[in-house]
Swiss-Prot record:
Lineage: Bacteria, Pseudomonadati, Pseudomonadota, Betaproteobacteria, Burkholderiales
EC numbers for this chain: 5.3.1.1
Signal peptide range in chain numbering: none
Role of this protein: Involved in the gluconeogenesis. Catalyzes stereospecifically the conversion of dihydroxyacetone phosphate (DHAP) to D-glyceraldehyde-3-phosphate (G3P).
NCBIfam families in the cross-refs: tim
GO CC annotation: cytosol
PANTHER family xref list: TRIOSEPHOSPHATE ISOMERASE
Active-site residue numbers: H94, E166
Designated name of the protein: Triosephosphate isomerase
UniProt binding sites for substrate: N9, W10, K11, G172, S211, G232, G233
Record bears the keyword Cytoplasm: yes
Protein source organism: Janthinobacterium sp. (strain Marseille)
Amino acid sequence: MRRKLVAGNWKMNGSLAANTLLLTEIKSGLGNATSDVAVCVPSPYFAQCQGLLNGAAIALGAQDVSSHEAGAYTGEVSTSMLQEFDCRYVIVGHSERRAYFAETNELIAQKTVRALNAGLTPIVCVGETLDQREAGQTDSVVAEQLNVVLASIAASDLAKIVVAYEPVWAIGTGKTATPAMAQEVHAMLRKQLQAKNAEAAMQVRILYGGSMKPENAKELLAMSDIDGGLIGGAALKAADFLAIVHAA
């Protein structure tokens, strides 16, 4: 039985005061959550959030990482820097990184390998746009995104990754993916993972990242191949985030 994972992605949001309030509320409302919980915060807040999460059953995560080990790469953050703040997870290949920063499947694969080599758990994001969805290209696009990553890692490392499906077409467009539609893609991803390592594929958690909210979390999380959520907007509101955590 795969333990659910609810990971909040704060994106480019937060402040010292707001972070303190948000994490204090989340910690106090966590109770005996049966899922794993993580927050992926902007890098300037690593030290603050590390302190706020001390002793809490909430893991710290990053929103991106460099494909390089160290050196003259202005603005980049390395895996060794993440390790110093006890980061456990790192998001790679988020749809916003692909769209706004021209990240390729190959670069995302390099970041995945870099994270694994550092003992971090990469949350590998895949997903299709509205145009791709309407052209019937969902399976081919998502499969190719994951294939490039899978080709870059050892079969023995498969169980060390997390996959997140982000239907880009369902984020901020007014369109929604039903639980059945999400499950269909998650099942396809699971089958793809099984081709790499059948046993490990059953351990890999596949998160749903298409605007999971308190209103739809329970239905989505009831699907057999939806193992948690990568939460955007709802992660910035303690009550909403906690509702999703407890739905898991």
